Amino acid sequence: LGDVYKRQKSGIEKAETIAGRTNFIKTHGMTVIDDCYNANPVSMKSSIEVLSHAKGRTIAVLGDMGELGSDEKKLHHEVGEAVGENHIHTLFAAGELAKEYAAGAAEKSSDVDIHYFEDRETMTQELLSYVKEGDTILVKASHFMEFPKVVEALSE
């Protein structure tokens, strides 16, 4: 059994993560959770829960989710509620529907520091001046929002 355990341990240690799929990146004294390949309400809430277990200041950087149909506003609102319920310190939200994240978070907690932006570019510039060493930052949105550019900016 010892050899089997050693091989399994070695395999796990050598495993490489895929960009945009819950990839933990250590950069500039911060931890960035790159989960921006795609998003739906269930994966958003799960990622927010993961973020809530981090030490230090927690920052959810969320963009719109696509292809949700007529319930899109309600579903974005519920994700915002999860931000408040999970005691996330700060929400940076970008996109037309991301207003609902802000509304949902504010509804569930007055302690969330909420920053809403209409576009990713403006949000990214503000985020770069906001983050500091020790922060854990979740970056998540549907692929069309191009949030890998946010991860790149945080990593430079």
Language model features: what each stretch is:
Residues 3-156:
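ATP-dependent carboxylate-amine ligase
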